[in-house]
C-alpha cells in the first residue's frame, strides 16, 4: 500500500543524529543503565537491554562504554538513578507531540519541557492527551530500490505485521515492539540492512506542515530534542522537505 514520502525526513534525522553523536551516546548510556537496572544485565534475557545495546553498537559506541553502563545499571558501579517520565502536548496547528525523558530531577525536567513548548507556540497537555494517536511499533526503513517482493517475503516470514511502500520508493516494515530484535536479525540474515531501525511511537495520521508553519514547528521539535533530559520526541507533524 502507498504511504507518505519518508526518505528525506529520515535522511535529515540521521544527519542530525550524526552531528550530535556525543548527545546520542549520552542518551543511549542512560537507556542502557535503566534497562539493566529494570531487567538485569543479560541481553539474552532482557529484550529492552538488547535493543539498547544494538542501538549503541549502531552508533559506534565502544564496547567498554556499553559494559560500564550495564554495570552501573545493575549496581556494580555508582551512577545516577534515572526515572522515566513521559510528557504530552501540542504544537502549532494542534500537532501532537510526545516527549520521553530520563531524569534524576523531575522538577528541572518538567520546567524545561514546559518552557520549550511555551516558547515556540505549543502547550503541554495531560497524561494520555495525545498518546492515543500513536501506535507503539518496531519500524524499519529501507532505501528506494530495495527489492520489494523479496523484502516483503522475508519480513512477513520473520513476523512483521505490515510492509508499506512509500511514494518516494522507500519501504517501511512494521512489527510488534517485542519482536523487534527477532525481525531485525532475520532481515539482516536475509541480506537486508535497514537505513533506520527503531522501536517508536508511530502516528496513526499525520498533520502536514509547510512554509513558515513548518519552520515554527521544527524549532519547537529541535528545542525539545536539545534538552539534556529528553530521550525521544515523537510527533504526528509531517514537515515538508524544502
From Swiss-Prot:
The keyword Transcription regulation applies. It is found in: Cytoplasm. GO terms for biological process: regulation of DNA-templated transcription. Pfam families: TACO1_YebC_N, Transcrip_reg. Keywords: Cytoplasm, DNA-binding, Transcription, Transcription regulation. The keyword Ribosomal protein does not apply. Coiled coil: none annotated. Gene3D superfamilies: 1.10.10.200, 3.30.70.980. It comes from the Bacteria. One of its GO terms (cellular component) is cytosol. GO terms for molecular function: DNA binding. Belongs to the TACO1 family. This is Probable transcriptional regulatory protein Bphy_2064. It comes from Paraburkholderia phymatum (strain DSM 17167 / CIP 108236 / LMG 21445 / STM815) (Burkholderia phymatum).
